[in-house]
């Protein structure tokens, strides 16, 4: 396939906001490509040349891209800069100035050159990147060049989510979505949809079924449902394991021989940030190859007390790492093991995995297996919960004893119960920032005064609004919000956002913030869970807690289903309170 043909598909996707239409366009594209192209096209759809967990970036600013364009288009850079200020999209400048109507490269040739650009480093690499990009611009159709520069700048933003791509992969093969569960299972245990698609194209459904957990490929993390009372845990699980819920970084640690990689909840490779944990893993799992999960939390070495998340988050940085190791040492509380010495053990029941974890770890001062109790007694669970709260922890997690580890799935195999506050919802809500409103009055000087936030509809692969928030952040945080959001601002509403509200500035759905609210109410202006009566669901008196949660991505946000579940639980609690007061 020629890159210009792929660009035509990008154009079609960009022009639609309908999920099914987007899926059909993708399915038509996938039908036309071979096993060598499918992997590369999946990555390019995401604006990348590798899976998300690989830190491969193009490393080219707008200034460098303009240099490459000036070189390729033979237009003075001053003229390009002047027009760019008017149109705001370097891709449109390619359309305006390119004379390459008869030229093109294949998708594979274009991808391979982009991969070279991303991997260039060291002395002379800047000029080499500019020259290679200029070669590509000069070799592609105007439309191809338009999408090329958007990819390089991280501004492709087609609004295509992984669920839509998985549906399209199935549809391309069997004209329905029946193969989606097999594709999703493979994706959940590899976090690499390009690789999964390539295996599928090479060997069909049987090859997909043979994909196994592999050290170095992060597994999409299992997630817990939430309840507001101990009794609900016993009702759903009966006899179960109860573990503490720590307020730190959830980590998935991969060790093979002397190589260690540490992935965050949203599958970022954070290995370099935690040299103390790497050292501990090599010591405490010295003769084993493992994938374990746990929660890393900073603590006061003099008192043994755990620091709150706002302190722990300071360990997540690129610079002065050794200084942070000394200031805020970490402990890791391991709660699961998914792979051991060549064996994928995700299918084993929780109780067996727990046993293998305890057997695999050696004693040390950094990594511990989380304590737990096994019971079906609500009083015993309540006592354990209160003990955790007293220790400064978030709450507890209950786990079904016979449950396998279900990668990427949120269900009632795991149930979390967090500390609640009088007049608040029993749990916070993780929302995605969709846009912002310019400040008025005192906040006019910041240029930002409120956020439009939403939750994720995982059935329709859309973000839906749930609140407009103007309280919580400090003045310094408002300034930081403006800075980070302006880096991802958009000219119009993204295709994967459903909203009745128009903020002053739309942004790419990328950053997650934690929201505390008093309750959930029905709303005529928000689209979360919107029903035939025109009413959706909204957070009442929402407040932002802290700044952006860098350990969470947009698809880790609270879902529409969870909001509806919280609303039903809230109504049930009110009925019970009213009956208690009779």
Swiss-Prot record:
One of its GO terms (biological process) is DNA recombination. Its cofactor is Mg(2+). InterPro entries: ATP-dep_DNA_ligase, DNA_ligae_ATP-dep_bac/arc, DNA_ligase_ATP-dep, DNA_ligase_ATP-dep_C, DNA_ligase_ATP-dep_cent, DNA_ligase_ATP-dep_CS, DNA_ligase_ATP-dep_N, DNA_ligase_N_sf. Signal peptide: none annotated. It is an enzyme of class 6 (ligase). ATP binds at residues 243, 250, 265, 295, 335, 410, 416. Its EC number is 6.5.1.1. It holds the Pfam family DNA_ligase_A_M. GO terms for molecular function: ATP binding; DNA binding; DNA ligase (ATP) activity; metal ion binding. The active site is at 245 (n6-amp-lysine intermediate). It catalyses: ATP + (deoxyribonucleotide)n-3'-hydroxyl + 5'-phospho-(deoxyribonucleotide)m = (deoxyribonucleotide)n+m + AMP + diphosphate. Keywords: ATP-binding, Cell cycle, Cell division, DNA damage, DNA recombination, DNA repair, DNA replication, Ligase, Magnesium, Metal-binding, Nucleotide-binding. It comes from the Bacteria. DNA ligase that seals nicks in double-stranded DNA during DNA replication, DNA recombination and DNA repair. Belongs to the ATP-dependent DNA ligase family. This is Probable DNA ligase. It comes from Dictyoglomus turgidum (strain DSM 6724 / Z-1310).
């Amino acid at each position: 396939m020629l890159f210009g043909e792929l660009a035509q598909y990008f154009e079609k996707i960009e022009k639609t906001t309908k999920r099914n239409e987007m899926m059909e366009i993708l399915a038509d594209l996938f039908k036309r490509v071979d096993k060598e192209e499918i992997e590369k096209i999946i990555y390019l759809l995401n604006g990348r040349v590798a899976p998300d967990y690989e830190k491969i970036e193009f490393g080219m600013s707008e200034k460098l891209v303009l240099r490459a364009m000036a070189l390729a288009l033979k237009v003075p850079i001053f003229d390009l800069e002047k027009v760019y200020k008017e149109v705001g999209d370097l891709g449109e400048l390619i359309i305006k100035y390119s004379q390459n109507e008869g030229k093109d490269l294949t998708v594979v040739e274009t991808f391979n050159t982009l991969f070279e650009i991303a991997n260039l480093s060291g002395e002379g690499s800047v000029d080499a990147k500019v020259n290679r990009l200029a070669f590509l611009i000069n070799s592609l159709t105007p439309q191809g060049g338009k999408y090329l520069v958007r990819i390089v700048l991280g501004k492709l933003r087609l609004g295509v989510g992984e669920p839509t791509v998985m549906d399209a992969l199935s549809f391309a093969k069997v004209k329905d979505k029946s193969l989606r569960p097999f594709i999703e299972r493979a994706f959940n245990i590899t976090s690499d949809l390009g690789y999964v698609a390539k295996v599928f194209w090479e060997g069909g459904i049987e090859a997909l079924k043979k994909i196994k957990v592999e050290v170095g490929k992060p597994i999409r993390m299992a997630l817990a449902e939430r309840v507001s009372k101990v009794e609900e845990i016993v009702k759903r699980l009966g006899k179960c394991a109860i573990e503490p819920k720590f307020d730190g970084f959830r980590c998935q640690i991969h060790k093979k021989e002397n190589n260690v990689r540490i992935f965050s909840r949203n599958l970022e490779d954070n290995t370099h940030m935690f040299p103390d944990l790497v050292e501990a893993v090599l010591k405490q799992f010295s003769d084993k190859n493992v994938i374990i999960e746990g929660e890393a939390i900073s603590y006061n070495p003099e008192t043994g007390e755990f620091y709150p998340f706002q302190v722990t988050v300071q360990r997540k940085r690129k610079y002065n790492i050794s200084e942070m190791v000394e200031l805020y040492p970490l402990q890791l509380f391991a709660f699961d093991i998914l792979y051991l010495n060549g064996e994928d053990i995700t299918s084993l029941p929780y109780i067996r995995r727990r046993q293998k974890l305890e057997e695999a770890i050696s004693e040390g001062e950094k990594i511990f297996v989380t304590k737990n109790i096994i019971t079906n007694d609500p009083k015993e669970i309540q006592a354990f919960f209160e003990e955790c709260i007293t220790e400064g922890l978030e709450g507890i997690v209950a786990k079904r004893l016979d449950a396998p580890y279900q990668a990427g799935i949120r269900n009632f195999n795991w149930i979390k119960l967090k500390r609640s506050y009088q007049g608040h919802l029993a749990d916070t809500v993780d929302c995605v920032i969709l846009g912002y409103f310019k400040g008025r009055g005192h906040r006019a000087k910041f240029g930002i005064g409120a956020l439009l936030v939403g939750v994720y509809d995982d059935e329709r692969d859309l973000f839906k609004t749930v609140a407009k928030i103007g309280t919580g952040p400090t003045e310094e945080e408002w300034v930081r919000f403006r800075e980070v959001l302006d880096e991802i601002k958009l000219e119009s509403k993204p295709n994967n956002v459903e909203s009745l509200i128009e903020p002053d500035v739309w942004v790419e759905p990328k950053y997650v913030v934690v929201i505390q609210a008093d309750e959930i109410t029905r709303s005529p202006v928000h689209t979360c869970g919107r029903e035939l009566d025109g009413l959706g669901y909204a957070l009442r008196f929402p407040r932002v807690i802290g700044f952006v949660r860098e350990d969470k991505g947009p698809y880790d946000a609270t879902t529409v289903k969870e909001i509806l579940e919280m609303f039903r639980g809230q109504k049930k609690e009110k009925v019970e309170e009213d009956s208690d007061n009779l």
